[in-house]
């Protein structure tokens, strides 16, 4: 199966693009569910979107997003350049699979989070066995994200030790780096002095 990735950059680009688009659509779907009522029981301080680059887009539920299209084009171009340099110029395919794994496995990890939120929010909206209300300050939300990503990095690390896969090693590193970033964001967060309504689309959001 890996032969297809050696022969052409297209399989890697298509895989990445499919995951990236799916990530964005899942984010918008869960953000809408959150704003439609899930936030009345599970409320997160600040934006639903953790990544600052996308927060305004997600807060506005902007499905057609120039920022997203620009990022998609840039990352696909990056993957094309990585394939050309590692496979055709340097002849070090391990580096390509490391980079591919870093991109794909962080997205796979994020998709697990999306699925968790989707089923949680669906249960809340259906009033299916979830009662009460809980609020998370943004630093707590970011620390939770960091712990989750550290855990995935460790899990991928165990798989790497058993397989020696450069693809999996890429996932170890990318999850670790994003976890560190979220931890740093939590430490830098300045608490809000104003409390916002759970139905305000511009300030309401979640993990």
Describe each model-derived feature in a short phrase.
Residues 2-207:
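Hydrophobic alpha-helical segments at protein termini of multi-pass membrane proteins
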């Amino acid at each position: 199966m890996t032969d297809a990735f050696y022969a052409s950059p297209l399989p890697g680009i298509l895989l990445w693009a499919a995951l990236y688009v799916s990530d964005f659509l899942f984010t918008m779907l869960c953000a809408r569910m959150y704003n439609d009522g899930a936030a009345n029981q599970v409320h997160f301080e600040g934006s639903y979107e953790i990544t600052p680059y996308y927060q305004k887009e997600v807060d506005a539920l902007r499905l057609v997003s120039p920022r997203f299209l620009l990022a998609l084009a840039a990352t696909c171009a990056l993957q094309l350049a990585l394939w050309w340099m590692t496979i055709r110029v340097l002849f070090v395919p391990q580096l390509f699979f490391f980079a591919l794994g870093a991109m794909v496995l962080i997205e796979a990890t994020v998709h697990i989070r999306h699925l968790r939120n989707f089923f949680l929010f669906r249960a809340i909206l259906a009033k299916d066995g979830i009662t009460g209300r809980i609020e998370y300050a943004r630093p707590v939300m970011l620390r939770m994200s960091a712990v989750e990503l550290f855990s995935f990095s460790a899990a991928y690390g165990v798989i790497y030790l058993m397989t020696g896969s450069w693809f999996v090693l890429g996932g170890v590193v990318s999850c670790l780096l994003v976890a560190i970033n979220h931890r740093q964001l939590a430490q830098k967060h300045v608490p809000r002095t104003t409390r916002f309504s759970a139905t305000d689309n511009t300030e309401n959001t979640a993990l």
